[in-house]
Amino acid sequence: MVSAPPAEQLIEDAPLTIAGRQFRSRLMTGTGKYRSIADLQASVAASGCEIVTVAVRRVQTNAPGHEGLVDALDWSKLWLLPNTAGCQTAEEAIRVARLGREMAKLLGQEDNNFVKLEVIPDPKYLLPDPFGTLAAAEQLVKEGFAVLPYINADPLLAKRLEEVGCVTVMPLASPIGSGQGLRNAANIQIIIEQASVPVVVDAGIGTPSEAAAAMELGADALLINTAIAEAGNAPAMAKAMALATTAGRLAYLAGRIPVKAYASASSPLSGTITARS
């Protein structure tokens, strides 16, 4: 039996590049909502991810579920993506981003200027504030941050954030932690078509099939947290999401068949056997 070659040998694909830094994995993961530190560690390993996001405010305040979180992971093998979760205004997000940069330095990542920018004043649906996000992004870019903004699937906002210097845009598939899946596919498709920076679909992905579908649209990467952390078996789901991310990317690069309104036989009709009259 001949074994199948690795995906990277089937079709040429460049690494994910964000702010000049290259990553092999196109799946990013979070650190919240895990049942235990052991579950977190096993899930990060199973996912094969290289970028892990951490909520700076919750780590700074030792919020429940975040005690010892930073020390639990090997940051010599992972790239820290500090995030400004919990910030309701641009001013708060800017202050927390600065703390996140200092956190990265303390973990040995002296050149890490990445920040996942979240400005979320809405406590029920956790939808990001476009005005606060844009204002914070403009200031953080001036301060030398590599800004990865979390946004609604708004093509105009995505383009504007790119113009002010953000290194990615991160449109939501559906509300954070909702597991509703890819509810904004049409707008995300437009964002992907217009963007010249990586598009990372973030929030709302609930299953591997939804992860694959997002990648099939042409997304450059995914950030998935709740669907992994709250799964019945978090490490197994992490592995499933990693496989789905790879499958979706490979399918996108391979090119799907066009959708038709009629059938098309997979076998030629010539040479078929017919009954005698």
Curated annotation (Swiss-Prot):
Catalytic reactions of this protein: [ThiS sulfur-carrier protein]-C-terminal-Gly-aminoethanethioate + 2-iminoacetate + 1-deoxy-D-xylulose 5-phosphate = [ThiS sulfur-carrier protein]-C-terminal Gly-Gly + 2-[(2R,5Z)-2-carboxy-4-methylthiazol-5(2H)-ylidene]ethyl phosphate + 2 H2O + H(+)
Gene Ontology biological process terms from the UniProt entry: thiamine diphosphate biosynthetic process
Top-level EC class as recorded in UniProt: transferase
Transmembrane segments: none
Involved pathway(s): Cofactor biosynthesis; thiamine diphosphate biosynthesis
Gene3D superfamilies: Aldolase class I (3.20.20.70)
GO molecular function per UniProt: thiazole synthase activity
Family, per entry: Belongs to the ThiG family.
PANTHER family in UniProt: THIAZOLE SYNTHASE (PTHR34266:SF2)
Protein name as annotated: Thiazole synthase
Organism for this UniProt entry: Thermosynechococcus vestitus (strain NIES-2133 / IAM M-273 / BP-1)
